[in-house]
């Protein structure tokens, strides 16, 4: 089995280099010609615009940058043949597509013009859309210190292309030094890429991830993992089926903390993992207000570990492992002037089986997880917004030893739970708009433009619904949004355990480039 896995890995490496060029294929999307030139019918006056039917006929792209057309089509859900009744609904459609593309922070600006043609024989009006986009600056290589009370210091040179090959998907490259919460040092290297491309008129994605650590304080200092995968989307009527396959290579994989007592710190040596998966997104065909379409998505994935001669797998790695999951939800969250606006809700359930434990007395082969969550973002004024998240999580036949991940101010590992209800509340104030490019009417100064947000927050959680089992934390976040570089922002968070300020280390710090939720 290991030899087969190696062959699969070699094939995937070949596909990786092939995929580097695939995004530049002229087979970008239906309705786009090779030279992206479309005949635009002359506009006409509307006799009864509210009764007219408009048909999306074509898309023309005017791109200032290197973003690819197929990426815009995918992100904007741009489909020809869509019928829209009423002129006001046509304008809403154009506004919606403009906002949908602007939500992608790899773009600096988006503008869509539309041209209405003469009625066809069936009385419907063809509509041609001209889409103007300008890329923001997306390439950066900077030393970035990052600190989290949960994982320690991470001082890393981070190279990023947030619009790699114009696919609107990032390429991440890290080289750095880490000092974790247990006082252990390591040198790290990471390469992470997902490359979407069009082939055979289908959407594909190539995944290539490499992680290398040198850990001198550990018994096995060298760690390496490679994941190489390929997935494809198959449209089926109004639904989408996604099928994929990942192949992993592991060297000296560290065991989860929950397994170390029984199986030691490491799975020593080399093993490989084959991971086929499939999911099916089934829209219900109606919108939940303005917050997106309700969709049900079942999925199944499996993991088969392959050992090498002389390097047997430990019991916790033997498997095979099967996961059945499904979700029901909707979401639409927009970026408006560096504030978030929108709402999303989801019910998610995951069920896992470890087949190697089924016939072993005292071993539990099954585990399950359920997550019910809702996230809302509201803009009150141009300087103030409110964000909130409600979440219920429960683990069956197991527990989560990092359940504090929903609380800023309490270390993740300090909370072990098999049930948790949590609420997060953020009060987002824009306290500074630093715009020298506007003040001095000089666009060359846009490099120094930024917005500064100050965000008091409160997080609470309970493992059971009683007043004796409540956790409460709070603090402040500061987020810097550079205008010149929309795809990058810096978040600094400081939170405290508000129920016990007497504890010496009752705080949690985060410095990084991701939002909390």
Please state what every model-predicted region is:
Residues 91, 268, 318-319, 363-365:
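Generic detection of long, well-ordered alpha-helical segments
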Residues 2, 25, 70-82, 321-323, ...:
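C-terminal transmembrane beta-barrel domains of outer membrane proteins
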Residues 2, 24-150, 158, 172-195, ...:
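Periplasmic polypeptide-binding modules associated with outer-membrane biogenesis and secretion
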Residues 10-19:
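Bacterial N-terminal signal peptides
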Residues 2-10, 329:
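Bacterial N-terminal signal peptides that target proteins for export
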Residues 5, 21-22:
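Compositionally biased non-globular segments, especially hydrophobic aliphatic-rich helices
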Residues 106, 111, 122, 126-336, ...:
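Gram-negative/organellar outer-membrane beta-barrel architecture
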């Amino acid at each position: 089995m290991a030899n087969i896995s190696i062959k699969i890995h070699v094939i995937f490496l070949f596909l990786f280099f092939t995929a580097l060029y695939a995004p530049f294929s002229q087979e970008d999307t239906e309705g786009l010609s090779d030279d992206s030139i479309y005949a635009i019918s002359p506009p006409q006056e509307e006799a009864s615009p509210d009764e007219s039917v408009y048909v999306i006929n074509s898309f023309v792209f005017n791109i200032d940058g290197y973003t690819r057309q197929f990426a815009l089509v995918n992100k904007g859900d741009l489909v020809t043949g869509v019928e829209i009744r009423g002129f006001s609904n046509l304008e809403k459609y154009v506004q919606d597509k403009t906002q949908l593309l602007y939500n992608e922070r790899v773009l600096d600006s988006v503008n869509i013009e539309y041209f209405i043609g003469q009625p066809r024989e069936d009385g419907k009006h063809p509509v041609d859309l001209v889409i103007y986009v300008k890329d923001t600056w997306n390439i950066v290589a900077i030393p970035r210190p990052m600190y989290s009370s949960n994982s320690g210091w991470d001082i890393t040179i981070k190279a990023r292309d947030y619009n790699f090959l114009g696919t609107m998907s990032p390429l991440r490259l890290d080289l750095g030094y880490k000092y974790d919460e247990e006082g252990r040092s390591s040198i790290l290297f990471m390469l992470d890429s997902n490359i979407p491309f069009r082939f055979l008129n289908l959407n594909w994605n190539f995944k290539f991830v490499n992680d290398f650590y040198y850990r001198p304080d550990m018994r096995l200092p060298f760690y390496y993992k490679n994941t190489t995968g390929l997935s494809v989307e198959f449209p089926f009527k109004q639904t989408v089926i996604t099928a994929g396959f990942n192949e992993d290579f592991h060297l000296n994989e560290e065991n989860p903390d929950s397994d170390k007592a029984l199986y030691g710190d490491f799975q020593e040596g080399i093993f490989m993992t084959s991971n086929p998966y499939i999911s099916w997104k089934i829209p219900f065909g109606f919108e939940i207000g303005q917050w997106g379409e309700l969709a049900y998505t079942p999925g199944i994935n499996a993991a088969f570990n392959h050992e090498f001669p002389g390097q047997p797998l430990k019991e916790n790695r033997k498997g095979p492992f099967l996961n059945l999951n499904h979700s029901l939800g909707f979401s639409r969250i927009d970026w408006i002037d560096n504030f978030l606006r929108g709402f999303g809700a989801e019910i998610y359930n995951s069920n896992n089986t470890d087949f190697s434990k089924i016939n072993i007395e005292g071993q539990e082969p099954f585990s399950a997880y359920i997550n019910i969550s809702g996230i809302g973002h509201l803009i009150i004024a141009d300087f103030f917004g409110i964000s909130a998240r409600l979440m219920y999580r429960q683990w069956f036949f197991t527990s989560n030893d990092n359940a504090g991940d929903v609380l800023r101010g309490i270390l993740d590992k300090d909370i072990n739970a098999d049930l948790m209800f949590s609420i997060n509340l953020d009060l987002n104030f824009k306290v500074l708009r630093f715009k020298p490019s506007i003040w001095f009417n000089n666009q060359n100064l846009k490099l120094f433009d930024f917005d500064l947000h100050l965000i008091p927050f409160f997080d609470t959680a309970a493992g059971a619904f009683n007043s004796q089992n409540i956790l409460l934390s709070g603090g402040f976040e500061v987020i810097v949004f550079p205008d010149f570089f929309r795809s990058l922002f810096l978040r600094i968070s400081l939170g405290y355990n508000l129920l016990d300020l007497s504890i010496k280390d009752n705080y949690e710090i985060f410095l990084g480039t991701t939002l909390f939720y």
